[in-house]
């Protein structure tokens, strides 16, 4: 939904933009029960959608709803100031960050970007490995493709909005650079990265590739990454991804929803879906990054 809204806005497709906003309306009125109240990062991240609609419409009802997700996430914190919803799974590096960054974009209030930066640095310290990639969790020492994609996309969204003089920007940028450099050596000849990034025998996975492409395109456009090297890698990824789209723009080879695993085989045996939203969204994010 977020990717569709940004793509519609960047292409000037007002009809699509309005249709997407209209589809949200029942969630404010007759279908409020479809919004989960559960205190879990995977449900909280939905708040990015009403916040994006607010940025497009300036209607305060969307701001109120979106901020309710961001503020409830910080209702309880650990002694170091991080939400107690943090699990130290790499997925969180997008789920938590994207919501708090979007709240900052909508309000300009520093507390939201500070939450995102604090969380990101804590996760970088705990999960990034010497090779630049990220374990799925401290007790799951595997470089899962989409999980690392969540990290790449989360850092990218944060760096897009994090003030240049923010005290944690240098640390986050260093983690981003280290990861981007690591990814270069694992990209397949087909342009895609693998289900387990460091296992070339594992299958090419599209949702991770879409997120890495998004991170690299954005990095090149903002001057964070060297254009010739990373632009070429991003282009190779994009051309590889479009080969996996069917006639209805459904992308295949998308890893199913995956909790942390405890063996290589667990990841290799995950089901590969077509049209799964985990894969559709990064295509839209990358398209949006190319248009910005």
Predicted regions and their residues:
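Active-site lining segments of carbohydrate-active enzymes
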Residues: 83-87, 94-110, 118, 122-126, ...
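Inter-helical turn/loop segments and adjacent helix faces that build the functional surface
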Residues: 11, 103-114, 158-170, 219-226
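Short linear capping/connector segments at secondary-structure termini
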Residues: 134-140, 192-200
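Extracytoplasmic mature domains of secreted/periplasmic and thylakoid-lumen proteins
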Residues: 40-99
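CBM-like carbohydrate-recognition segments
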Residues: 7-22, 26, 30, 35-47, ...
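Oxyanion-binding "anion nests"
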Residues: 152-197
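Long, well-ordered core segments of solenoidal/helical folds
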Residues: 15-36, 61-83, 110-133, 173-192, ...
């Amino acid at each position: 939904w977020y990717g569709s809204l940004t793509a519609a806005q960047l292409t000037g497709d007002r009809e699509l933009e309005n249709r997407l906003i209209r589809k949200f309306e029942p969630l404010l009125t007759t279908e409020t029960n479809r919004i989960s109240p559960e205190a879990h990062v995977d449900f909280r991240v939905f708040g990015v959608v009403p916040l994006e609609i607010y940025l497009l419409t300036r209607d305060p009802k969307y701001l109120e709803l979106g901020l309710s997700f961001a503020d409830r996430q910080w209702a309880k914190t650990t002694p170091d100031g991080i939400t107690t919803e943090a699990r130290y799974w790499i997925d969180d590096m997008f789920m938590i960050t994207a919501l708090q960054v979007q709240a900052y974009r909508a309000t300009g209030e520093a507390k939201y970007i500070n939450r995102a930066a604090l969380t990101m640095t804590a996760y970088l310290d705990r999960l990034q490995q010497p090779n630049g990639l990220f374990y799925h969790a401290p007790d799951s020492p595997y470089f899962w493709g989409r999980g690392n994609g969540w990290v790449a996309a989360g850092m990218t969204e944060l760096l897009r909005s994090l003030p240049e003089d923010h005290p944690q920007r240098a640390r986050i940028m260093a983690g981003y650079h280290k990861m981007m450099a690591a990814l270069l050596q694992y990209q397949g000849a087909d342009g895609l990265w693998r289900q387990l990034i460091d296992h070339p025998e594992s299958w090419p996975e599209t949702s991770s590739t879409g997120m890495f492409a998004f991170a690299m395109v954005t990095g090149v456009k903002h001057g964070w990454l060297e254009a010739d090297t990373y632009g070429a890698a991003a282009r190779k990824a994009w051309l590889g991804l479009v080969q996996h789209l069917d006639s209805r723009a459904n992308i295949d080879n998308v890893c199913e929803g995956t909790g942390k695993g405890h063996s290589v085989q667990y990841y290799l045996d995950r089901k590969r879906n077509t049209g799964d939203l985990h894969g559709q969204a990064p295509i839209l994010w990358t398209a949006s990054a190319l248009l910005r």
